[in-house]
Curated annotation (Swiss-Prot):
Keywords: Cell cycle, Cell division, Chromosome partition, Cytoplasm, DNA integration, DNA recombination, DNA-binding
Cytoplasm listed as a keyword: yes
Any one annotated GO CC term: cytoplasm
Annotated protein name in UniProt: Tyrosine recombinase XerC
CDD domains from the UniProt entry: INT_XerDC_C
Origin species: Staphylococcus aureus (strain Mu3 / ATCC 700698)
Cellular compartment(s): Cytoplasm
Active-site residues, Swiss-Prot/TrEMBL: R145, K169, H238, R241, H264, Y273 (o-(3'-phospho-dna)-tyrosine intermediate)
PROSITE patterns, alphabetized: CB (PS51900), TYR_RECOMBINASE (PS51898)
Length: 298
């Protein structure tokens, strides 16, 4: 990458508090763009709208999802906007490029009985289950991101207020409450999980060697739980986040509260969770519609 691109990434890190994960995505987008420039014998400074359209076609030819293409174009549009503030001769070739529409999807979630089955799998008090259960409890009870989970320190847990302070996107702190089951799980883990009693750091969630667990490690733990649970398949940390939001909304929580708990900046981001299960839809319909049931039906 050239010095302008490096300065751009540094600005995102210092002034806009972008996470390392987000910065890595921006960096990868710029590297791929540079490879295209080299392949087509194009220059960054003379890149124009026609070239931008060709680049869009190039991305689609690599069989990328529309969401990925949309993000890559957004990265380059933002980069050129930054460059324009430094050089008045620069023109943003991506400003008129129409964003590819993102695929619409309903977030996947677990039904309540599926969650109960997952918890039943880790209910026996073995050393591994103590750790696995606290991971499952925290993700489901709080809806936090896996990146937030792995960075929780022991001092972030507030047993007086029954909640945890996490560092979210943009380095923003938020407090998320948890319930009695999650509290008990954390207490049992801290008291009986041997690696945490002998480690020399403050991270809460550890691997079996006593080291701070990684995001990949969390995914491995969740996949292992699913393998041991009958009737449940396909799990990932964000699915538990979807489940957290869906179950709250299904039980009557308002959208603003869920937005705050999830740490979303925009309410529209939380809006995707307003879907409900078919079972819940039918329940609401049967109870609400005047002609949903005959008089002799219950």
């Amino acid at each position: 990458m050239n010095h302008i691109q490096e300065a751009f990434l540094n600005t995102l890190k210092v002034e806009r508090n972008f996470s390392e994960h987000t910065l890595k995505s921006y960096q990868d987008d710029l590297i791929q763009f540079n490879q295209f420039l080299e392949q087509e014998h194009l220059q960054l400074k003379t890149f124009e709208y026609r070239d931008a359209r060709n680049y869009l076609s190039y991305l689609y030819s690599n069989h990328l999802k529309r969401t990925s293409v949309s993000r890559k174009i957004s990265t380059l549009r933002t980069f050129y906007e930054y460059w324009m503030t430094l050089d008045e001769n620069i023109i943003n070739p991506f400003v008129q490029l129409v964003h590819p529409k993102k695929e619409k999807y309903l977030p996947q979630f677990f039904y309540e009985e599926e969650m109960e089955a997952l918890f039943k799998t880790v209910e026996e008090d073995t050393s591994k289950n103590l750790r696995d259960r606290v991971i499952l409890e925290l993700l489901y009870a709080t809806g936090i991101r896996v990146s937030e989970l792995v960075n929780i320190k022991k001092q972030d847990i507030d047993f007086y207020a029954n909640g945890v302070t996490v560092l979210g996107k943009g380095s923003k702190e938020r407090f998320v409450p948890f319930g009695a089951y999650c509290r008990q799980s954390i207490e049992n883990y801290l008291e009986h999980f041997k690696p945490i009693q002998s480690c020399n750091h403050d991270f809460l969630i550890l691997n079996m060697k006593g080291e701070a667990i990684t995001e990949r490690g969390v995914r491995y733990v969740l996949n292992d739980i699913v393998k041991r649970t009958a009737g449940v398949s396909e799990i990932h940390p964000h699915k538990l986040r979807h489940t957290f939001a869906t179950h709250l909304l299904n039980q009557g929580a308002d959208l603003r509260t869920v937005q705050s708990l999830l740490g979303h900046v925009n309410l529209s981001t939380t809006g995707k969770y307003t879907h409900v299960s078919n079972q819940q839809l039918r329940k609401v319909y049967l109870n609400a519609h005047p002609r949903a049931k005959k008089e002799n039906e219950t």
